[in-house]
Amino acid sequence: MTTPPICSYEGSDYQERFWDQADRAYEDRVEAIALRRLLPESGRRLLELGAGAGRNTPRYTGFEQIVLVDYSRTQLEQAQQRLGTGRRYTYVAADIYRLPFAPSAFPAATMIRTLHHMADPQAALRQVRRGLATGGTFVLEFANKRNLKSIARWLLRRQTWSPFDRSPVEFAKLNFDFHPQAVADWLRAADFRLERRLSVSHFRLPLFKRLLPLSALVGLDSLVQWTGELWQLTPSVFVRARAIGADEPAPSGAFWRCPACAGLELHDQLDGLACASCHRVWPLRDGIYDFRESPA
């Protein structure tokens, strides 16, 4: 089965270069506020899609188990170094378009700073919905093409694409901005009900960061995030959606799903997970399950 192209951070120093060494403490803190407002305080199991090096994972303190998924094994290795290898964390290298989880395996999921790398966001959202139980919570962040900066640039004829057109814009290879209404439509089509929207990162421009202290910027952003219910004009938008409709049938307690044959009976063995249906063995190396390439 062919899948859309994948944006891989394999071997990347993204966490260090983009977050640790760059001036993005403001973005990090306002995203943390949005997550607190949208996620349940506690839960049995959380699916973190696009977990990367685990920047947000420590914020999910109320969940008993967190399953970190990323296409990049090296990003997950960094997450392991940050979080450890205890039973609370499960590390999974996987393709978002072929997630290795049984239907209804999770009561909650997040996807932060990840959808903007999806060439087929609708297919990705359908995969998320299949893994969530009916009534489950999904917190999604996406890059908003209809933000004030892009509107101004378009009005001044400094960019060719319209921020009001609902089609995604690919401003760099496998980097997309999305229209808020398009994302809302995709979520509904995937059997999600939108519950809340937050506008985040109002003051991302370097000018604001030079003029105001970090605490003031964070406080101001926190005060106006609620405006996402009225309009979405910030570069980042957070959405809380609820899984609705009927779940796919699955045996009670099923967790894994073979990406190759869709079998739901996978057994632990020393070197990985063996599918009882197609007999493939999905490898487990140094505490990281790898479902990216189909083994022979």
PLM region spans:
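A conserved beta-strand element that flanks and buttresses the S-adenosyl-L-methionine
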Residues: 110
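A short glycine-rich, Lys/Arg-flanked "PGG" loop and its adjoining helix->strand segment in the class I
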Residues: 122-137
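Conserved class I S-adenosyl-L-methionine
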Residues: 1-42, 75-78, 139-162, 292-296
